[in-house]
Amino acid sequence: ITFSKIYRSCKSNSVCGNQKCVRGRCV
């Protein structure tokens, strides 16, 4: 089972593109 890309793990905002890294997830 895979979660939506919205909740992919991250360590910085740059990983999320136009999203922000919050609590290790892109939102």
From Swiss-Prot:
Task of the protein: Not toxic to mice by intracerebroventricular injection.
Tissue: Expressed by the venom gland.
Cellular location(s): Secreted
Keyword list, A-Z: Secreted
Family: Belongs to the u18-CNTX family.
Tagged with keyword DNA-binding: no
Name under which the protein is recorded: U18-ctenitoxin-Co1b
Organism per entry: Ctenus ornatus
GO CC term (a single one): extracellular region
Main location: secreted
